[in-house]
From Swiss-Prot:
SUPFAM superfamilies: BEACH domain (SSF81837), PH domain-like (SSF50729), WD40 repeat-like (SSF50978)
Protein name: BEACH domain-containing protein lvsF
Biased composition regions of type Pro residues, renumbered to the chain: 145-158
Chain intervals with Low complexity compositional bias: 779-788, 795-822
Alphabetized InterPro entries for the sequence: BEACH_dom, BEACH_dom_sf, BEACH_Domain, NBCH_WD40, PH-BEACH_dom, PH-like_dom_sf, WD40/YVTN_repeat-like_dom_sf, WD40_repeat_dom_sf
Start and end residues of each BEACH-type PH domain: 289-384
Keywords attached to this entry: Repeat, WD repeat
SMART domains to which the protein is assigned, alphabetical: Beach (SM01026), WD40 (SM00320)
One Pfam family hit: NBCH_WD40
Classification via CDD domains: Beach, PH_BEACH, WD40
């Protein structure tokens, strides 16, 4: 985002032409054209001359006067001003003619003429900073010319606009040089006619003979440039401190290049820049600390909107420095602590992978461009892998998605993050961040965010919102020949012109640069919000989206506004400033005679600030939260290109997509430049960052619930820390007393105690600050979420459920299926099972402060599964020792023990009334055990190999997995005597896996189940249609655990190598991390995740995506001596606090509770 004023000084690099380089500036005096040189002297103006590659600028010290730009292409000559004939006839004269006898003395013989001396122009291949040849060595073999006739001074012409009255020489010319040899009589005669120069007597003066001068920034205002035409007038200057010939030689080179073809000129100037860069090295005296060790120094350029500034990059062991090749910036040398760099992203620039953007902890950023991809990658690896210790974790993308889903990150911040990740940056107008149109109502007097009609349909691109216009686009699409790339939209939703269309009032310099010194036609200017919306809704040439400035929250500071994606300093940025003509810019008059001034706002907005505030509220509304993932699919996701883009009516011109053309392969400079210009004009589609449907945001009720749990955990953490702090203080006090009593005997002990106490205090202080900050952030988010109405919550929940089903390709007969479920539940009201249902009814709350209660040795081998009864008094467990055990915690004894078969028992499911247990065994069978009878009541041969996992849902569906690679779906029944039976023939038998099935789980609504295989694949099945929905490769090793979150929208998967992933039911990865050791089991309530490994327990928050350390939860370290192979978390019905059961490899069960 841009600040209101780009620079504190008037001249900035945006005043130059595209592709122009700034070289140097010098203190100078300008002598305005006047009738006499004495008058010019009296009117002299102090300022600075700025030498650039395509023009020379003069910036007066008086800000009321305009900056003057002299393009080299409009100059006829540059040279030293010696006298009135300094800008006399050109050095390159016409074809020589005999000297007229009337000029020569008839009484004297005709002298032998001396050929004139001409200045040799530098060779195009010579370095621009090489020393020019001396005048004495520059001669031209020209025969005796006819001497020119002196031309009388013509009357002073009038410029096309108001300007100082100039004296004009009508003859075009080039520099005239004086020969070091004795002049000929002819030249002597000419010199006698030259008038002495008053200015030349005052010092070294040079002139610029130009036919055009461009004036800008008069009174420091950003008005359109004034182009003044002259008849080759002499503009005279002098330098204050530098030798004149040094600067003139360089300017003459640029003047010579201005007459060449653009491609050749650009190449020559590029050589000059490279030559200068090679001669400039970093000034090591500017190091912040002279003890810093230089690691890497190389050439690069700093990129900002419409500007490229070459310079030198130095990386030390402590800081990163950028030294521009010029001194245009107020603080020429920039240095950044490596510790302040929090993110480094590789960028494209000019369609090449040569950019690198660095983000700092104060919210600022630095965009650097390198000569090639190899150099860019070298710098990236050096910073990310070796020097910058505060770089965010590689799984940051998943962490952001998780936080957004849970409401910790706002929609605004998440969209900024996705833009950033997709290569969009505030430093490059060709890749500026893109935001969606949200509101569709710009006529009502009040903005009703509770009406769906108020919002734009986010599931469709802008071009598809109007069906009539879409039909036009589709007709054109079908008319494009098959051998040509097809597209729906010939224009894009984001281009530099569109960005400045919105921001012209805030950064007019950029519009003037883009439009060659003029503002756009008044009828095309940004005039009214409603008018612009109607245009993007109806015009066949306008499908532009919005920019972040429309939604910037009022509480946002510059340090937090862009996720490190900002441009210049915008501490004084006022929301909505881009909608007001605060500089009184002359933007023009429309055809309807309306003057363009401030933007006309919709009736429901009282001011620009109110307008931005209401748009931000709309962006954060529940409707947008539940539908924003559709727009993300269009812009950043799987509907961005290819067949999905065609189906979504979201296909743009092929050159807008990344990778559509290899710009490096175009060797012809004309074609390459044309291609770059074409793509920049068409716009660039963001980098595709999602290949699968983007997960939906959690409903507001669930977000609030997770935030409440997180807040409760943080508060308990702080209480725990304060308790520890108090204990430390008490210990210190006791130690002090002991010191007083036993000062001579306990010195060593006291020192150790004080040292430990200081360490504890430092740790505690750090944790207090971190937790207080977290509480403040979550409290503010929680309060913001609570402002929405309950009706809106209910509506969003129903919409969320529908969206989830539709996004997975389910048929639109969910009502029939739901009715069938209701009937099944009515008939078998008492047949429900532990698992998702019980966890869904009660969240665990905090697990941070569990404490070890007792250990029970029940089995001889690894415990494969275990559950705790509803009343928290009975433990059920099965083991690889082939035994089922039932243990009474109240009686502290084993109630049942049954050896079902000769092989291991892998899993079991428990009925809610706890009267029946369904067990899977390695002997290929599925058993139903009656707790009351203490015997097997039913069994069936389930698979052709070991049954590895079972899952039973309350709609009488049992799913089983096996080592034979199959997954089977069974229907269960309750017999007249209350016993459970399983149909002998499965209703579905899936053999989609190539390896054994390791884990199975069913969503809470009973519509989907997932199976994980030992080769790392995850299979999604529809329980309604009994069909495979999708197959995803999750890991490269054995997938050991699957667990649906209670809301049914996400699946937790774990690999034996310690990797854990949270995946949306649409198949997108939401969050991932890795723990130490091999994972064997896990459990979750959707907010917390507890994992059992061969090194004990791990605890993670699924709200913030952070690990709960054992410093806060001591029970985690207490479990580290055990290899945990099964676990179960339940709620104690009497205390309403969680109880954790863990089963070990040795066959023992541990109980943890608060």
């Amino acid at each position: 985002m841009f600040s209101k004023n780009i620079n504190k000084v008037r001249f900035n690099l945006t005043l130059m032409d595209e592709g122009e380089y700034y070289f140097d500036d010098y203190s100078a005096i300008f002598y305005p054209p006047s009738n006499t040189e004495e008058e010019s002297w009296q009117k002299r103006i102090a300022g600075r001359i700025l030498v650039c590659s395509s023009s020379m600028f003069f910036e007066p010290d008086d800000s009321k006067l305009p900056i003057m730009k002299f393009p080299y292409k409009d100059m006829s000559s540059i040279g030293a001003w010696l006298n009135s004939l300094s800008s006399a006839p050109p050095a390159h004269l016409p074809t020589p003619q005999p000297i007229p006898q009337s000029i020569l003395s008839p009484s004297k013989p005709t002298p032998t003429p001396t050929p004139p001396i001409v200045v040799e122009q530098p060779s195009p291949t010579r370095s621009a900073f090489s020393r020019l040849l001396s005048f004495s060595s520059l001669t031209s073999k020209v025969t005796t010319p006819t001497p020119p006739t002196p031309t009388p001074t013509p009357p002073t012409p009038q410029p096309t606009s108001i300007a100082p009255t100039p004296t004009i020489a009508t003859n075009p010319y080039t520099s005239f040089s004086v020969s070091p040899n004795p002049p000929s009589p002819l030249l002597s005669q000419l010199f006698e006619q030259a008038k002495p120069s008053f200015l030349a007597s005052k010092g070294d003066i040079f002139y610029v003979k130009s036919s055009q001068v461009i004036e800008m920034k008069e009174n420091s205002r950003n008005h359109p440039y004034i182009f003044k035409q002259y008849n080759n007038i002499d503009f005279k200057f002098s330098f204050n401190y530098v030798k004149q010939n040094i600067v003139l030689d360089v300017m003459k080179v640029f003047h010579n290049y201005s007459g060449k073809e653009k491609i050749q000129r650009d190449e020559l100037i590029k050589q000059m820049v490279e030559d200068r860069e090679n001669k400039i090295f970093f000034d090591i005296t500017q190091l912040v600390d002279m003890n810093e060790r230089n690691i890497l120094e190389l050439k690069c350029s700093k990129i900002s909107p419409l500007v490229e500034n070459p310079g030198r990059l130095l990386i030390t062991n402590a800081r990163l420095y950028f030294q521009p090749m010029n001194n245009i910036e107020e603080n020429r040398l920039k240095n950044y602590s490596l510790q302040s760099i929090i993110r480094v992203l590789q960028r494209r620039h000019s369609l090449r992978e040569i950019g690198l953007e660095l983000f700092f902890d104060d919210g600022s950023s630095l965009f650097l461009k390198f000569n090639n991809t190899i150099t860019r990658n070298q710098v990236y690896d050096l910073l990310v892998k070796h020097l910058c210790t505060n770089i965010m974790h590689i799984n940051e993308q998943a962490n952001y998605l998780l936080k957004w889903q849970n409401g910790i990150i706002s929609n605004y911040d998440y969209l900024l993050y996705l833009n950033n990740l997709a290569g969009r940056t505030f430093n490059d107008l060709t890749q500026y961040p893109v935001f969606p149109w949200i509101i569709a109502d710009y006529q009502s007097t009040t903005l009703d965010l509770n009406r769906n009609e108020t919002f734009r349909d986010l599931s469709k691109p802008i071009g598809a919102l109007n069906p009539t216009r879409l039909a036009t686009f589709q007709d054109r699409y079908h008319q494009i020949p098959d051998d040509q790339p097809k597209f729906l939209y010939g224009t894009h939703y984001s281009t530099p012109a569109y960005v400045l269309y919105f921001l012209v009032r805030q950064v007019p310099e950029y519009m003037l640069r883009l439009q060659n010194g003029r503002f756009d036609s008044p009828n095309r200017m940004f005039y009214s919000i409603e008018e612009t919306w109607n245009s993007v809704l109806n015009s066949t040439t306008d499908v532009k989206e919005l920019i972040p400035e429309f939604y910037k929250p009022s509480f946002e500071s510059s340090s937090s506004s862009r996720n490190g994606g900002g441009g210049d300093d915008d501490d004084n940025f006022e929301n909505g400033i881009f909608l007001t003509n605060s500089e009184n810019l002359p933007l023009g008059i429309r055809q309807d005679n309306n003057v363009i001034n401030d933007i006309i706002l919709p009736p429901w907005a009282s001011s620009p600030k109110d307008f931005i505030s209401k748009l931000h509220q709309a962006l954060e509304s529940e409707y947008v939260s539940q539908n924003l993932h559709h727009w993300i699919d269009l812009i950043f996701g799987y509907k961005q290109k290819g067949e999905e883009a065609v189906r979504a009516n979201n296909l743009f011109y092929h050159l807008t997509y990344e990778g559509s053309i290899d710009i490096e392969s175009i060797t012809n400079p004309f074609e390459r430049e044309g291609m770059e210009a074409q793509i920049n004009e068409f716009g660039q589609t963001p980098r595709q960052i999602f290949k699968t449907p983007h997960p939906q945001r959690l409903p507001q009720q669930l977000r609030n619930q997770n935030l409440k749990i997180e807040l409760s955990d943080l508060e308990q953490n702080i209480n725990f820390i304060f308790d520890e702090l108090n204990n430390c203080n008490i210990n210190e006090l006791n130690n002090d007393n002991d010191n007083n009593l036993n000062n001579n005997n306990n010195n060593n002990n006291n020192n150790n105690s004080n040292s430990n106490s200081n360490l504890n205090n430092n740790y505690i202080d750090s944790n207090i600050n971190n937790n207080i900050n977290n509480i403040e952030n979550i409290n503010s988010l929680n309060n913001e979420n609570n402002e929405n109405s309950n009706d809106k919550k209910n509506n969003s929940n129903s919409n969320s459920s529908d969206n989830i089903k539709n996004s997975n390709g389910f048929e639109n007969n969910d009502n029939n299926f739901n009715n069938e479920n209701e009937n099944l539940n009515d008939e078998n009201e008492n047949l429900t099972f532990l698992g998702e249902e019980r966890n869904n009814s009660n969240n665990w709350g905090s697990l941070n402060f569990l404490k070890f209660n007792q250990n029970i040795k029940l089995h001889k081998d690894k415990i494969s599964a275990l559950y705790l009864s509803n009343n928290s008094e009975t433990i059920y467990s099965v083991s690889l020792d082939s035994c089922l055990k039932i243990y009474s915690l109240k009686e502290k004894r084993q109630i049942r023990s049954l050896n079902l078969c000769n092989l291991a028992l892998s899993s079991f499911q428990l009925s809610k009334d706890e009267k029946y247990i369904i067990i899977g065994s390695w002997d290929n069978n599925i058993y139903v055990y009656s707790v009351g009878n203490g015997s097997i009541s039913y069994s069936i041969p389930g698979h052709s190999d070991a049954v590895s996992c079972l899952k039973l849902h309350n709609n009488n569906i049992l799913v089983s997995g096996s080592w034979d690679s199959s997954v089977k779906v069974w229907r269960t029944h309750r017999q007249s005597n209350g016993a459970i039976s399983i149909e002998k023939t499965p209703i579905a038998d899936f053999v989609d896996s190539d390896t054994e099935i390791r884990s199975i789980d069913i969503s809470s609504n009973g519509t989907i189940f997932c199976a994980g295989s030992s080769d790392g694949y995850l299979y999604f099945y529809d329980l309604l249609t009994l069909q495979l929905i999708r197959r995803i490769s999750c890991f490269f090793d054995e997938l050991v655990c699957i667990k649906f979150t209670p809301d049914g929208s996400r699946i937790i998967t774990a690999c034996i190598d310690g990797s854990v992933k949270l995946i949306g039911i649409e198949g997108s990865e939401i969050f991932s991390f890795k723990v130490k050791g091999e994972i064997h089991c896990l459990d979750s309530d959707g907010s917390s995740l507890i994992i059992g490994t061969d090194r004990g327990l791990c605890l993670w928050s699924l709200t913030t995506g952070t690990e709960i350390k054992d410093s806060i939860s001591p029970f985690l370290s207490q479990s580290s001596n055990e290899s945990i192979h099964s676990l179960n978390v339940s709620i104690n019905q009497s205390s309403n606090k969680p109880i954790l059961l863990t089963g070990t490899e040795a066959g023992s069960i541990s109980i943890w509770q608060q």
